[in-house]
From Swiss-Prot:
InterPro entries registered for this protein in UniProt: Ribosomal_uS11 (IPR001971), Ribosomal_uS11_bac-type (IPR019981), Ribosomal_uS11_CS (IPR018102), Ribosomal_uS11_sf (IPR036967)
Record keyword Transmembrane present: no
Subunit structure: Part of the 30S ribosomal subunit. Interacts with proteins S7 and S18. Binds to IF-3.
GO CC, alphabetical: ribonucleoprotein complex; ribosome
GO biological process: translation
HAMAP family from the UniProt entry: Ribosomal_uS11 (MF_01310)
Protein name (Swiss-Prot/TrEMBL): Small ribosomal subunit protein uS11
PANTHER family associated with the record: 40S RIBOSOMAL PROTEIN S14/30S RIBOSOMAL PROTEIN S11
Keywords on record: Ribonucleoprotein, Ribosomal protein, RNA-binding, rRNA-binding
Role of this protein: Located on the platform of the 30S subunit, it bridges several disparate RNA helices of the 16S rRNA. Forms part of the Shine-Dalgarno cleft in the 70S ribosome.
GO MF terms held by the record: rRNA binding; structural constituent of ribosome
Signal peptide extent: none
Family of this protein: Belongs to the universal ribosomal protein uS11 family.
Amino acid sequence: MATVSRKKKKVKVTPEGVVHIKASFNNIMVTITDVQGNTVSWSSAGKNGFRGSKKNTPYASQVTSEGAAKEAYDLGMRHVDVFIKGPGAGRDAAIRALQGAGLEVRSIKDITPLPHNGCRPPKRRRV
């Protein structure tokens, strides 16, 4: 029995928005929301086909940001404020990709959480 495919509901959004970039040591996630915090588009390195150690590369973050930004641009978003969280590689590449996709970056803010000597950190890597 064939299922009826429904068309995805496309909603026009306001021209202003917020980009949340979470760059961990293992992955990068980009979420674009409107000013109220409702998600407009999102993307991650794993969603774009990167696996394993390739997920935390500047190229992966560039592809991830471009995908989310193009989707938001098509829905009508033009100006964004950027919030970056995490120590991962490719933080700068993600912002450059947002600008390359046509979104005007108005402000960049680093909201990486810093402990006031909380939990003991993981042991040092020996590479």
